């Protein structure tokens, strides 16, 4: 008798990348259902979000909207990993914010892959090519979910 366990799946969502590239209004409950198709067991559901503390201090609607969104993600079973926006000024005096969660997402996926059969990366960012290759080398099936502006190299991988 052959014992077949359910497929163990991990979902890693770059929320800002999806929102910027056609995924605004993403149905995270549907994403979970899609990832767990075929009776797959969700071992890890991570959502990487950016948060601007300066803006939240001045804009109650932004703050409350973000907190409500994070609460919704948690209700769907996602672990919310928050990256605070850091503000920089370039040599021309232009101010810009950055809250890049790519490294956190990559490290988490690689560390947790020991317990996964399939990894769903919800991002179109070409920086994840080596992560995809490393996960595949570890024996994981990797699926990419993205909408617009998907890296051509990532599509091929």
Regions found by a protein language model. Give the residues of each.
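Well-ordered alpha-helical segments embedded in enzymatic catalytic cores
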Residues: 30, 104-108, 127
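Internal catalytic-core helix/loop-beta-alpha segment
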Residues: 82, 86-122
């Amino acid at each position: 008798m052959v014992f077949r366990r359910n497929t163990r799946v991990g979902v890693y969502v770059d929320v800002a990348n999806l929102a910027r590239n056609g995924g605004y209004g993403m149905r995270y409950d549907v994403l979970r259902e899609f990832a767990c198709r075929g009776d797959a067991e969700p071992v890890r559901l991570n959502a990487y979000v950016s948060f601007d503390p300066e803006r939240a201090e001045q804009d109650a609607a932004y703050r409350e909207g973000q907190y409500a969104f994070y609460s919704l993600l948690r209700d769907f079973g996602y672990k919310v990993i928050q990256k605070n926006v850091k503000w920089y000024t370039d040599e021309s005096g232009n101010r810009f914010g950055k809250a890049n969660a790519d490294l956190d997402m990559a490290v988490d996926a690689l560390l947790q892959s020991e317990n996964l059969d399939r990894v769903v990366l919800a991002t179109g960012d070409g920086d994840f090519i080596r992560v995809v290759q490393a996960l595949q080398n570890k024996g994981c099936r990797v699926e990419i979910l993205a909408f617009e502006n998907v890296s051509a190299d990532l599509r091929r991988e």
